Amino acid sequence: MKNLDVSWDGIHDATGYLFSLAKSLSCTVKNSPWHAYAEDIVATSGFAFRMWVSADLCPSATSIWGFDGQKPWVESGGLSCEYAGRYWGQDHIEKEKRLEAIGNIKRSVDRGVPAISWDIGIPEWGLVTGYDNETETLATLSAAPPFERGTLPYEKLGMRELPLLSVLTITGENGKPQDEIFRDTCKMAVVHLDGGEWCDNAKGLEAYPALIRHFNELYNDEAAWNREYLLGNYGALKYYAWRYFEKNGHANHGNFAKISCGSHLRKRAFVGN
């Protein structure tokens, strides 16, 4: 068994509900030669700006999006990636994509970098930290408390509780200049604020009033955990947005508020001033 010594130590998650893919992405980059990107990548990939709320506050609604967007989004943040995935209704390519994903995982672990995978521990993202060709198993680390380590047979990758395959590996830096990363981050933030997602949930800026209604006229004691989860999830993500703009000199005084609300952000993204 080849297994990397990786933990969630040093990954900022003040609420305990940080989106598991963002948490896994930051941890993977932190445990790579490109660790300088570990905090920024949550924002520069666009995940820090994404919000959507279903009518019944279903926590699974946060996982309804195009998984194959991970590669171009992360590469927009300055890192090169490999991605292997499969959706429902693609059983005819299940084996092909699973073998591709396992190959990507092995190469990544051999480089000393964990892989990000869907359905690790619970139906959320987590890390693949190792592999064993003799037993044909993968070593895994869950992003959800109690952060259990486990093993997963090769044949079960992408075939567990929710049979979708999504494996992202980081392969290096792509040389993208920081000013271009900032400009493209602003563009992605605008798209997300405007609700540029293919799901039917309230999204972008519309997610705020949709969530607030569940604290007022739609208040229900039985939905207490759902409200806590969504607030914790998006609140933790917005920390990374704030940190990124702070580093780039746009979090002081009114500038960050303008960027957050979208008007100033649109100008910076599409006009340049």
Regions found by a protein language model. Name each.
Residues 89-107:
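Mixed-charge, Lys/Arg-rich low-complexity intrinsically disordered regions
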Residues 104, 114-115:
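Generic recognition of flexible, low-complexity loop/linker segments
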Residues 2-92, 110, 116-123, 131-273:
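Cys-His-centered catalytic/binding microenvironment captured across papain-like cysteine peptidases
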